Amino acid sequence: IEEQLEYIVEKYPCKSGIKTMFILGNHDYSHMRNAGFDIGKAVAKERTDMVYLGQDVADVNYGKTKIRLFHGCKGQSYARSYRMQKYVEQIPSYEKPHILLMGHYHNSFYMKYSDVYCFQVPAVIDQTPYARSLGLNNEKGAWIADFTTDKYGNIITMTPEFLDFTD
């Protein structure tokens, strides 16, 4: 655990004026379950530019626009859109975000569904031997989203750009 913490603190990019807001997922939770260690809290304590928002799900307000960070835990489905669609459908209307950033599946995908702009966030690591043995896809990359809003935070225009980090 200490090596992982040290690696994140030393290697994760740091740029003046930019904060990274992050959540943890199911693999990170294993540290909590097995050793009682919350690596998210430890990272945020060491890096003032990194804001830990908790485990699995968090909402961030960017002005009046609500952005939800969500880390799933189920396996990949037959279609990339399926898990996002089912997740958006179960969010109560009063809680619905304008933008959903969904991790865990190591794939990239973008769609607008039920008035939510949905991004499946890819991996930033190479495919693991375990994922390879299961025949799971692993895309490396990131999204940049350029959007405009009205005075209520509703999205008027959205221009997604995928950055492919494939070797």
Where are these regions (language model features)?
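Residues that act as N-cap/strand-start positions at coil-to-secondary-structure junctions
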Residues: 52-56, 139
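Flexible, charged surface loops at secondary-structure boundaries
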Residues: 14-16, 61, 92-96
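Conserved beta-sheet core of the metallophosphoesterase superfamily
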Residues: 66-161
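Short, solvent-exposed polar/charged micro-motifs at secondary-structure junctions
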Residues: 32-33, 61-65, 69-70
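Core catalytic region of metal-dependent phosphoesterases/phosphodiesterases
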Residues: 1-52
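Short, well-structured alpha-helical interface segments that form or flank functional binding sites
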Residues: 3-7, 34, 55, 95, ...
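Charge-rich, low-complexity terminal tails
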Residues: 24-29, 34, 148-167
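Short acidic-hydrophobic surface loop/beta-edge motif
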Residues: 56-63, 111-113
